[in-house]
Amino acid sequence: MDMLRNRPVKGSLDHDPQLSADGTNTPAASDGSDQRSDVIEKTAQLSEPIADSIRRFFEIRKLDGPDGTGVVFENISVEGSGTGAQAAPTISSAARSAFGVLSPLQHRLAGQFSRPILSGFSGTIDAGEMLLVIGKPGSGCTTFLKTLSYMWDEYKDVHGDLTIGGHPIQESMVKRPQDIVFCAESDDHFPTLTVAETLRFAIRARCGPEASATEVDMMVAQLAKLVGLSQVMNTKVGDAYIRGVSGGERRRVSLAEALATCARLICLDNPTHGLDSSTALEFIETMREWTSQSRCVTAMSVYQASDAIMPYFDKVLVINSGRQVFYGRIGDAKAYFERLGFECLPTTTLSDFLNSMSADPEVRRVQDGKQHLVPRTSEEFEAVFHASTFYQDLQRSLETAKVEARTNPRPLVKARAFSLPLHHQIWYCAYRQFRIVTSDYSLWAVEPATIIVQSLVLGTLFRDQKRATQSLFIFASALFYSVLVPALQSMAEFGNGFAQRPLILKQKRYRICRPIAYALGLVTTDVVWKIAAICYNIPLYFLTGFQRTAGNFFTWFCIVYLEHLALSMFFRSVAIFSPNMHRAVLPVGIFFNMYVLYTGLYIPAPQMQVWLGWLRYLNPLYYAFESVMVNEFRDLSYQCSPSDLVPSGLGYTDMANQVCAVLGSRSGEESLSGMSYLEAQYGFGRSHLWRNVGINAAFFVFFALCSGIGMERLKTPAGRLATVFYKGRPSIRNSQADSESGAVHDDVPPDVSRQLSGDQHHLNANSERDKNHTLAWTGLCLDIETKDGTRRLLDNLNGWVKSGQLKALMGVSGAGKTTLLNTLAGRSSIGTLTGTLALNGQLLPKFFRSRMGYVQQQDIHLPTQSVREALQMTARLRRDESIPLEEKNAYVEKVIEWLDMEDIAEALVGVPGAGLNLEQRKRVSIGVEMASKPEILFLDEPTSGLDGQSAFSIVRLLRRLADSGQAIVCTIHQPAAELVEQFDELYLLSRGGKLVYDGPLGTHCDKAIEYFEQHSRACGQGENPAEYFLDAIGAGSRKEVQADWVGLWQQSQQSKDRERAEKALVPAEGQAPLAPARRSLYAVPFHVQLWVVVQRTWLYYWREPDYAMSKLWMSVGNALLNSLTYLQSPNTQRGAYNRVFSAFMSLIVGPPLGLQVQPRFVTLRDIFVHREREGFTYHWLAFVFAGIIVELPYTFLTSLVYWLLWYFPVGYFRTAPRAGYSFLMYELFAVFATSLAQMCASLMPNIEAAFAANGFFFMFCNTFAGTLSPKPVTPSGWRWYYKVSPLFYLGEGVTVDVLQDLPLRCAESEVSIFQPPNGTTCGQYAANFLQQATGFLLNTDSLSDCQYCRYRDGQSYYQQYGYDFANRYPNIGIFIGFIAFNFTMVLVMTYLTKIRR
């Protein structure tokens, strides 16, 4: 550790504490006078431009000479919810819980368990000091930082005292909450904004309205310079799906946001995650200077901290399983633990040594003869620390701080929690949202295009309707669609805000903007954007032939606009008050169907049942529909169409003896008043027009406020922070071990498996390897086309890796490490690749990818698979068919044993926080690839995000695999010296994908060091070789390259020797590629692939009961809504209308069904595309067919529930042929809805676009179902579409089935009355008419007031829709054909959008 002496700090790292009489450690005398000088010495080592940049930033920010305040915490204890290990939920367990069949009390009490996370933490952090928090994942580091940041609402209970500047944290958070900031490990940003826009928003929000635009821009420039982002300011931030800056640069954006707050207490959770060692060191240097100049307090956890980083910290806190085992000067920590009997090897970094005190006992090195004297458990460590003089000094410092706070109290001046007033926040949020909308192609181009298409189709379908009674229903349908399309758009948008929740909460913590400001900013943007959205519907208005006056048009526009706003706010509020998207789908689906049903068209107000009619008063869609109908009909009269005249035909010419058989008409009148029709048919009133506009405006305001309030009350869900789910019940051993650990991590559950210890398992190389393999590459170049021309990512690279070799692939940020790894593994799909790839001297064929293992940086797994199931699936699908299944499973058990995963073999992978921890997930990722028994194993950043001990555990595992004969290539970012020495060879890249070294590392990296020392400075004693290599070639944003390392390597003797050796490893020109061992690209036949993937998909559905229960309850809710609305419909004229629309309403559940189906399909697709596809695990058809096959049983079951609750209560035929036909058609419809949803999901790039597309296609299908737009009155240009409209065949079949042979009668209000000529009976006068009429006379012998009932039976009623009973059975086959077409398109669209390259 001599290298560390070059950086003196308070409490020098080589300081040796004295041993007190009681056997505890006593620190050497220190008067504390060197505190300021130590800080000066540290900052003096920084480059002057950085110090100047910070100083300049503070000057612009007007923070000269801030009043520094310290932090004091005493006896802090934290409890969180969680049960450690428990059985995974399934559909059966959810059913038992829902219906209370078995132990209902158990489920109610399941969430009441609490576990200690932190116990009795105490300490002080003075102003200008930096605290390093060390502990393995799961020990409580994140919890401690969140507790300092007063994020207490995430936990069940927090005890103890925490003060800032002598004031209780509660008081500080009330008066100055902006002084505390917590930067999480995740990077949450708006991906379509640029880096400059992201930082400008944060700085503008924290500086307040006083800062000018010039000052804000200057601060943005200075901050970008500090964190090394100056070159990417105009690049999108991006995310996993949107291309933007690199992962390391995105991390620096997050850190820059945290610094922009200029808080007095800055807590950073693993801030160097994703940064290479040089960039990480630069950031810590920046934080040292920032902390010293601002006199703030900085606390951070850092995993895999190098020795170069450690001196910049003043104090260190070591946590073991939620207990404080050391707190003091960082220079005293090493000696303290050495005095306890532990040993720190020369090659072990101080960070890793301290971190081992948090790990399991097996990974700690103990001095000879002290094995039984050292503490082992966290309780023992805590007891030893409490008995030491370090703890006594800590207690004295606490008392001193208390006395100082009492004697010299510092006034706590209350300041605004947010620098910007609320109205300014709303304005900036609205502007930001406008930028997001305009930068997202799908929002400003795709969505308007779909709306315009909808409007044009509907407008031409209802084009130029005449002012006649025959067009009354057509006008009503067109007006209904004008309010329905915005409703569909609003429903499709409900899920857009879930992804932004972590970002909104982060900006609330940073006091950048209030969540309510974000919500109202969205509202402000909507107010503008929805105007444009409604404008796209204008073709519908004018093409249909609505009243073309300015007053009527703008009234219509205002009505639809306010309805769109109100519904958008409503569905957004539902989403905000729902914990996640899956839970939100249920209320959204039920409310959407209720709104559509109670619009007033499907069931007019006079026909509504008394027990549900009140629902219309809660329905913005009802108010909008009534208003647009009144707006259109109020001043018009409609000529009675010949088909509506009773009687009509030859000999019936005197209107005095005729009547218009339409509700609202009067005997002897040739025209019908529009308002009379509305009042009689729908119960609408003229005076309701502007009243309804006002009500919808009130709905908009109310729901907007609800969304704002709901957003303001958003909290990070505490959840069950430490739950690992097992198949069945977890073993007692696992539960006990987990309970004893007592530690919980916010993001990662505690380690329930044992750590890798030494060489616990021996890997037999010869027994498990078929042969030795050598992968060689020569002249590799990769070029891509950009807007600025051709860009080379890889530049003439040569190299090889052999069986038994562990090769480290390193380089500066952006050097192309992952690109090279993808290229070697055959996974690169971009640009033009040239050069040669060979295995054992033969060219690589395409099939060889299935025999290579590739462990991605992201651990992508299906959450519901157990560890053993995940490995067994890979073994079954990627190992040759000729190998017996028993042998494959036996090999999986060996892999599980090698990776020390026996204890978690039956655990579900889960998600972070409710599943395996980060290291366990990484082991599973490695195990999945090892189960395929690959010839070459590639790993991309396997230690990223891990603590030092976990990283070493993973690398040591790789070392053992290499010793067993496995060839391994591994990229690595921040390797400690101990990690680097585990590798055999180093492959080092510089910027531009150029090679600067390829060769052996040697013992303690001496061979590689010797090469670099020939052309650069000498490697310091104890210096990390990896950092030395990267520093030499100019890694980091502030380094300048001092030599042409690419040229030096090409001219070196080592390079020439490697080139000569490579010639024997590459094929001669014209040599044939390696002969495939099998004909197929896949190891097993397709039917085996399909069976295995279906099994996995079935378990995915079975073990996530939320989906099945949501699907079931949506069916129950919508069926009851439909059946209770049309309960026992009578055999009247309106009863026939109700029977038709009840059947039609059963088809409206399609879009909500899509909301449930599509996320499942997308999840399965993404797992295949991002992990399983590249390894030829199984054919893409297998996952598509599996998604279809497994979905169908759930579809059949829930549609059966819907049909039973709907069909019989409405009063349809109960004969087996009729009921059976209806049941069959509804089951087919449910399958059709599933197929359409999956087709849209396969077509669209993301789930939001899939939601919108599903609504779009369903609107088309429903439009041409023949009910709202009857075929006989459809313009001839559109009649052809009924032949290709699937729901027309369904609607025809169901309608004729429920109406055929149904005798109809007339209620009193439905009778049309006309007067016969004097002296003529009604029967005599209407005899000729009745021969061709669809209705009948009620009083044929009367001489006056002839009563005519328009329809005599069901078939006479459905003829108006162009339906025919003879088509009933042929429609079944046709509809099945449409279903087959949809599923075929699922295959085609999946291939075109995700498979074809």
Curated annotation (Swiss-Prot):
Q: Which Pfam families match?
A: ABC2_membrane (PF01061), ABC2_membrane_7 (PF19055), ABC_tran (PF00005), PDR_CDR (PF06422)
Describe how this enzyme or protein is applied in practice: Patulin was originally used as an antibiotic and specifically trialed to be used against the common cold, but it is no longer used for that purpose since it has been shown to induce immunological, neurological and gastrointestinal effects. Genotoxic effects of patulin with dose-dependent increase in DNA strand breaks in brain, liver and kidneys have been detected in mice. However, more recently, it has been proposed that patulin might also have anti-tumor properties.
* Stretches the record annotates as Disordered: 1-45, 734-758
The principal localisation class reads: membrane
- Give the originating organism: Aspergillus clavatus (strain ATCC 1007 / CBS 513.65 / DSM 816 / NCTC 3887 / NRRL 1 / QM 1276 / 107)
Q: Which gene encodes it?
A: patM
Annotated binding of ATP, by residue: G811, V812, S813, G814, A815, G816, K817, T818
Output this protein's name.
ABC transporter patM
What GO molecular-function term can you cite, just one? Answer: ABC-type transporter activity
An annotated GO cellular component of this protein is:
vacuolar membrane
Cysteine-cysteine disulfides? none
What job does this protein perform? ABC transporter; part of the gene cluster that mediates the biosynthesis of patulin, an acetate-derived tetraketide mycotoxin produced by several fungal species that shows antimicrobial properties against several bacteria. May be involved in the secretion of E-ascladiol to be converted to patulin by the secreted patulin synthase patE.
> Per its UniProt record, what PROSITE patterns does this chain match?
ABC_TRANSPORTER_1 (PS00211), ABC_TRANSPORTER_2 (PS50893)
